[in-house]
């Protein structure tokens, strides 16, 4: 699968959910603001036919808005993981995670070698990660792919912290997910 979506669109406005709540449908609000494991919800929706398709797992430059939310300087380097979460053969979510660890390099590197294993299983597995507030973003024709859909592109992000490790998880909810639930 090729990457059609990305989080580097100019002018993205990440906001606390209260600022955009009135623009969300009941269904999108339920999914975007849920603090539980998205992986678990997608497994239920897909009758356990959820596939993780890795697109990128490497060390790279962190985008400016990512560095800002993580409290890092522009041009900072971190682990970058991009995947599609696919249900019934259709991409439902595009996820980009940024992993920074000022402690053990090995621990951070392990998260870049997950392959088709969901990151959510680790983040929610043992309860050791603390999750920040969820921020949301609505794309306004930011991607050509979204312009062809009747469903707006919504994304959310939050930071998971455990000791010296910080994992910024950004999830874009794709039109195929909303179509599956309609």
Curated annotation (Swiss-Prot):
GO molecular function, one term: chorismate lyase activity
One Gene Ontology biological process: pyruvate biosynthetic process
Entry annotated with the keyword 4Fe-4S: no
Assigned GO CC terms: cytosol
Recorded catalytic activity of this chain's protein: chorismate = 4-hydroxybenzoate + pyruvate
Class of the enzyme per the UniProt entry, highest EC level: lyase
Keywords, ordered alphabetically: Cytoplasm, Lyase, Pyruvate, Ubiquinone biosynthesis
Enzyme Commission numbers on file: 4.1.3.40
Principal place of residence: cytoplasm
Entry's localization field: Cytoplasm
Residues holding substrate: 81, 119, 171
NADP keyword on record: no
Pathway as given in its UniProt record: Cofactor biosynthesis; ubiquinone biosynthesis
Record-linked Pfam families: Chor_lyase
PANTHER family named among the record's database cross-references: CHORISMATE PYRUVATE-LYASE
Family of this protein: Belongs to the UbiC family.
Protein's job: Removes the pyruvyl group from chorismate, with concomitant aromatization of the ring, to provide 4-hydroxybenzoate (4HB) for the ubiquinone pathway.
Name of the protein in question: Probable chorismate pyruvate-lyase
Organism per entry: Pseudomonas putida (Arthrobacter siderocapsulatus)
Organism placement in taxonomy: Bacteria, Pseudomonadati, Pseudomonadota, Gammaproteobacteria, Pseudomonadales
